[in-house]
Design a protein with these regions (language model features):
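C-terminal motif of bacterial Sec signal peptides marking the signal peptidase cleavage site
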Residues: 15-18
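Periplasmic-binding protein-like
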Residues: 34, 89-100, 120, 154, ...
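An alpha-beta-alpha
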Residues: 54, 141-188, 289-311
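Hydrophobic alpha-helical segments within soluble ligand-binding/sensing domains
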Residues: 131-153, 266-286
C-alpha cells in the first residue's frame, strides 16, 4: 500500500512537471511601424515613393508585421512616438518617422529599450536614433541651369523647411550661373499644411499668375520649380487651364502628366534608400547615426524629357552640359 502511494505521488509529480513545461516559444515576428507625414499618401510623388519602398520590402519579407499610422497633426505624431518608445516586448522593432516635419518631436528623446528609430530627410543628428538626408543642392542647381531659357518661379509649400530652402537656393544659383532671366519665389502657406493643399494651390496660382502678368515684370517663357509635396497635383491641374506655363517634375518622373509641359524631372529615390536600411535592420546591422547622399548617388537624379521640344530646347544636351559642374557645386556647398 505504501509502495502504491509512492508510485502515485511520483506519477502526480511527473504530471505536474509535464504541465508546467512549455514547448520552446517561436521568436516574435519583426515589427515595423511607419508614422507617415500628416499630408498622407496618394500624392503621386514624394510620399508614394517612400510607401513603394516599404511595401516592396514587406512583400519580400512576409514575416515582418507592418503598421502604418496616419497622424492628424505633428502633436498627434508626437504622442504616437512616445507610445512606441515606451512599449516593451521581445520582438525586433523598427520605427520610421517618414517626414522631416517630425524633427522636433524626436529631438531629445531617449533611445528605445528595444528597437531602433529612423527619421527621414533631415540634416540633424539625433543621439540614440538614426537619420539621413538626400541632398538637394546639386540636383536643384542642375535643374536651374537646365532652365536657363525660362523665367523661373520657385514655388514653395512653406518657408523655413531646410530641405526646401536648400532646393530653392540650388535652383536659384544654377539658374543665375547659366541665365540672365529672373527667378521669383512664391510661398503657398505658413506651415506644413502647405504640403496638402491641392485645391488651394490651383486658386493661389490662378490669382498670382494674373497679378504677375499685370506687374510688368514677367517676360519670356515661365517655368515653375515646385517644392510642394502633396500640393503639386494642384499645379498640374492649373496647367490644363493655362497651357503657357512649364513645370519641372518633382520627386518622381512627371513626364506622364504632360510631356509638352515638363522639360525634366528631379527624381528623389527614397524607396531605394529605405530598402537598404530595412534590409540592414533584418540582417542585424546597426544603422549609422547619420548619412548624406547627393547627386553622384543613385538616390537623386535629374531625368531629361527627350520629348520636350519647346523652342527647340534639347534637355538631354543641357543635362550633359551642366552635370559635372553641378556635382562640383554641390561639393563646394557642403563644405
Amino acid at each position: 500500500m505504501r509502495f502504491q502511494s509512492v508510485i502515485s505521488a511520483l506519477f502526480l509529480l511527473a504530471a505536474l512537471l509535464s504541465c508546467g513545461k512549455e514547448p520552446d516559444a517561436e521568436p516574435a515576428s519583426p515589427e515595423l511601424t511607419v508614422i507617415i507625414g500628416t499630408d498622407g499618401y496618394g500624392d503621386g510623388s514624394y510620399n508614394d515613393t517612400m510607401l513603394e519602398g516599404i511595401l516592396g520590402f514587406c512583400k519580400d519579407h512576409p514575416e515582418v508585421n507592418l503598421t502604418l499610422q496616419q497622424p492628424s497633426s505633428v502633436a498627434d505624431a508626437g504622442k504616437r512616438l512616445d507610445s512606441w518608445l515606451a512599449a516593451e516586448g521581445s520582438a525586433d522593432r523598427a520605427l520610421i518617422l517618414a517626414s522631416n516635419t517630425y524633427e522636433d518631436i524626436l529631438r531629445g528623446k531617449p533611445a528605445p529599450k528595444n528597437g531602433r528609430v529612423l527619421i527621414l530627410e533631415t540634416d540633424d543628428v539625433f543621439p540614440g536614433h538614426s537619420s539621413y538626408i538626400i541632398r538637394r543642392y546639386g540636383a536643384s542647381w542642375l535643374s536651374g541651369a537646365m532652365s536657363r531659357f525660362f523665367t523661373g518661379i520657385i514655388f514653395k509649400a512653406m518657408d523655413g523647411n531646410d530641405m526646401i530652402e536648400e532646393s530653392a537656393r540650388g535652383f536659384s544659383d544654377g539658374h543665375s550661373a547659366a541665365s540672365d532671366n529672373n527667378v521669383y519665389t512664391w510661398t503657398l502657406a505658413d506651415g506644413p499644411q502647405g504640403f496638402a493643399m491641392r485645391d488651394s494651390t490651383y486658386r493661389f496660382v490662378y490669382r498670382k499668375y494674373q497679378e504677375f502678368l499685370t506687374s510688368g515684370e514677367y517676360y519670356g517663357s515661365l517655368l515653375f520649380f515646385p517644392l510642394l509635396g502633396g500640393s503639386l497635383p494642384g499645379l498640374f491641374d492649373y496647367s490644363r487651364y493655362n497651357g503657357f506655363i512649364n513645370i519641372a517634375g518633382m520627386d518622381v518622373d512627371c513626364t506622364a502628366y504632360n510631356p509638352w509641359v515638363v522639360p525634366y524631372s528631379l527624381c528623389v529615390n527614397n524607396h531605394l534608400v529605405l530598402k537598404n536600411y530595412l534590409e540592414d535592420w533584418l540582417a542585424g546591422t546597426l544603422w549609422p547615426e547619420h548619412q548624406q547622399f547627393g547627386l553622384e548617388s543613385e538616390f537623386i537624379q535629374v531625368v531629361p524629357n527627350t520629348q520636350y521640344n519647346f523652342a527647340n530646347q534639347d534637355m538631354l544636351a543641357l543635362y550633359r552640359d551642366f552635370y559635372s559642374q553641378a556635382v562640383e557645386k554641390e561639393k563646394a556647398y557642403e563644405k
